[in-house]
Regions:
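Sec-dependent N-terminal signal peptides
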Residues: 4-13
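Sec/Tat signal peptide C-region and signal peptidase I cleavage site
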Residues: 15-19
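Thiol-based oxidoreductase modules, predominantly thioredoxin-like and allied folds used
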Residues: 23-28, 48-50, 62-89, 98
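A short beta-strand-turn-helix
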Residues: 26-43
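Short active-site neighborhood of thiol/selenol oxidoreductases, capturing the structured segment around
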Residues: 40-54
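Loop/turn elements at helix/coil->beta-strand transitions in domains of secreted/extracellular proteins
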Residues: 40-44, 75-78, 101, 108-112
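Non-catalytic, surface beta->alpha helical segment in thiol-disulfide oxidoreductase systems
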Residues: 99-143
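Oxidative protein folding and maturation machinery
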Residues: 148-263
Length: 263
């Protein structure tokens, strides 16, 4: 009997230790959590879920209990979980426009968004959820810095590197906003031309339009074949997407032919 008791005790302690190792979600209202966030100097992490969300349940059962999650989240955040369909979760869903589950919010002490991961679940511990959060924070901080006017060469180089991995759509915008002003000569330098070749793949991107409008000058630096191959590849991708999505193909073709004729 004593032996059975000891074995049961060991299993209980093991379960307790595992629970302690994982993420500590506190039973607090949103208002209480914000107050504690301010008092402790930690940001607020909110797991926004619904009862019918399968990935939400997986995260709670298999990911948040991991030691690496506990080490990271418990050290840096006040953590709460909120059902977006009941209690103060309803207000949170409305305030932060939560449309995908799970969504993970990281809030500043005043309730403003520091970072968010919409549909941020992982499907395996091997995917490293902690690193996913860190990457999202890195992107959010870089976006804020860019929006605040940072344009120095070292920052832009690092920012574009981040965007190439995490936000291809924004990358197109940032490259157009920062690279056109360099002029054709600079854009034909190996590093810049490689970026254009690999990342500019949308016919409506201003940088692509700039390339088409100045194709003759680009060709003098890079060779006509090199430039025309790039232009044709972007048009080909556009046609493929149009057909796949069933968009008004004929009208779009007419617009693009006119653009090509004008340049």
């Amino acid at each position: 009997m004593k032996r059975i008791f000891l074995i049961s005790l060991l299993f209980s302690l093991a379960g307790y230790c595992l629970a302690q190792e994982g993420t500590n979600f506190e039973d607090l209202t949103f208002k209480e959590a914000l107050a504690k966030s301010q008092a402790t100097g930690k940001k607020l992490f909110i797991d926004c879920y619904t009862k019918t969300c399968g990935p939400c349940k997986y995260m709670v059962k298999f990911i948040f209990p991991l030691k690496e999650c506990g080490d990271y989240f418990n050290s840096n955040y006040i953590c709460i979980m909120k059902d977006m369909e009941e209690g103060d979760g309803i207000d949170i869903a409305q305030k932060y426009d939560i449309r995908v589950y799970p969504t993970y919010l990281i809030l500043n002490h005043d309730g403003t968004v520091y970072c968010r991961l919409d549909g941020g679940a992982v499907s395996s511990p091997k995917e490293d959820f902690v690193q996913k959060v860190k990457d999202a924070i890195e992107l959010a901080e870089a976006n804020r810095k860019y929006s605040a006017g940072a344009r120095d060469r070292s920052f832009l180089k690092e920012y574009i590197k981040i965007l190439r991995v995490h936000d291809k759509k924004r990358l197109q915008t940032v490259m157009s906003e920062t690279m056109i002003q360099l002029g054709v000569d600079k854009l034909c330098e190996p590093e810049n031309w490689t970026l254009i070749k690999t990342e500019i793949n949308n016919v409506d991107t201003p940088l692509f339009r700039y390339l088409v409008e100045n194709r003759a000058t680009f060709s003098k630096h890079l060779g006509q074949q090199e430039v025309e191959d790039k232009i044709i590849s972007v048009y080909s991708e556009e046609f493929r997407v149009l057909k796949m999505m069933g968009i008004d193909f004929d009208k779009r073709m007419t617009d693009l032919k006119q653009f090509e004729k004008d340049h």
